């Protein structure tokens, strides 16, 4: 009798133990402690991919890894939860304590994610600015021309042609190599005045040689010292059109005057040594000989008569 009573007492104890073990399920070889627990994210490191969630019922901190997030924000590139965000999760038993699993938002919604997590390219906050399509300008001009044609049907033909003018093209500056060719930069841009004499030109040339030469911006450039009057430069073929337009009649008149003046001075210098000044004694002798020669023919003519 006693043995039968003991066996009957052991059977309810075994049934109670089995009933207590039924809610404990496994999630990927981990024992589930609780399900659908609400908690607040204490902190989460996006770079390392882990953080802690504080349970609202027991005020216990639960470890959470980014792989445990079940429904992530579709706009975020990485899985994460934001600091102070309310989430819903399951508590499982890990190697070092309680861990969170199946982390979602309150209800079957995705989590908001951390503000430090990178967004996907398709969900940019400020999209890139793209220019108008290629045929946008042609379509715009065609629409404008159509509207103008409808409005100018009653207007004369002259006014219609004046309104439809092509847009002026923008002029860009020439490249650097055509603006300043190598080794052709003038040292001084001052033009001499017309009223200066030859001596003034020579003194000016000497003064320019005495001045310190301006350093050219090009490395390895050696200035060439000029001797004599400066030569007239021919206009550059690769110069700018604007520079040619700015050259007026004044520069041409200055150049012509300088060429004439230097020619006159040069001829004067060449002729000067050919006709030296005669001395006083030679002048008196020449005058006496000329007087004697003139008197002798006159006397011969008188005797003949």
Swiss-Prot record:
Residues 123-132, 257-272 have a biased composition (Basic residues). Keywords: DNA-binding, Nucleus, Transcription, Transcription regulation. It is found in: Nucleus. GO terms for cellular component: nucleus. One of its GO terms (molecular function) is nucleic acid binding. The keyword Glycoprotein does not apply. Binds the B box promoter element of genes transcribed by RNA polymerase III and is probably involved in the regulation of class III genes. Residues 273-286 have a biased composition (Basic and acidic residues). One of its GO terms (biological process) is regulation of gene expression. Residues 1-11 have a biased composition (Polar residues). Residues 1-24, 98-305 are annotated as: Disordered. Residues 39-103 form the CSD domain. Its main location: nucleus. This is B box-binding protein. Residues 177-186, 194-210 have a biased composition (Low complexity).
């Amino acid at each position: 009798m006693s043995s039968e009573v003991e066996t009957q007492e052991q059977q309810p104890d075994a049934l109670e133990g089995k009933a207590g073990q039924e809610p404990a399920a496994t999630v990927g070889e981990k024992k589930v402690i609780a399900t659908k627990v609400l908690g607040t994210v204490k902190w989460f490191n996006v770079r390392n991919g882990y953080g802690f969630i504080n349970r609202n019922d027991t005020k216990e901190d639960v470890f959470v890894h980014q792989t445990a997030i079940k429904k992530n924000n579709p706009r975020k590139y990485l899985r994460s939860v934001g600091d102070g965000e309310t989430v819903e999760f399951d508590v499982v038993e890990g190697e070092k304590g309680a861990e969170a699993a199946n982390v979602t938002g309150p209800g079957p919604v995705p989590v908001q994610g951390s503000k430090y997590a990178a967004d996907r390219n398709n969900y940019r906050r400020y999209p890139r600015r793209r220019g108008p399509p290629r045929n946008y300008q042609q379509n715009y001009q065609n629409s404008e021309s159509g509207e103008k044609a409808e409005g100018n049907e009653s207007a004369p033909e002259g006014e219609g042609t004046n309104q439809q003018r092509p847009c002026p093209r923008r002029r860009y500056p020439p490249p650097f190599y055509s603006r300043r060719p190598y080794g052709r930069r003038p040292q001084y841009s001052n033009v001499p005045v017309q009223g200066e004499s030859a001596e003034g030109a020579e003194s000016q040339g000497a003064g320019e040689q005495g001045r310190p030469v301006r350093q050219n911006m090009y490395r390895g450039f050696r200035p060439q010292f000029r001797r004599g009057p400066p030569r007239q430069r021919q206009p550059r073929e690769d110069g700018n059109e604007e520079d040619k337009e700015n050259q007026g009649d004044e520069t041409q008149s200055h150049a012509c005057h300088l060429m004439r003046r230097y020619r006159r001075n040069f001829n004067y210098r060449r002729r000067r040594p050919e006709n030296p000044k005669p001395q006083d004694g030679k002048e008196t002798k020449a005058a006496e000989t000329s007087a004697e020669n003139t008197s002798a023919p006159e006397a011969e003519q008188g005797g003949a008569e």
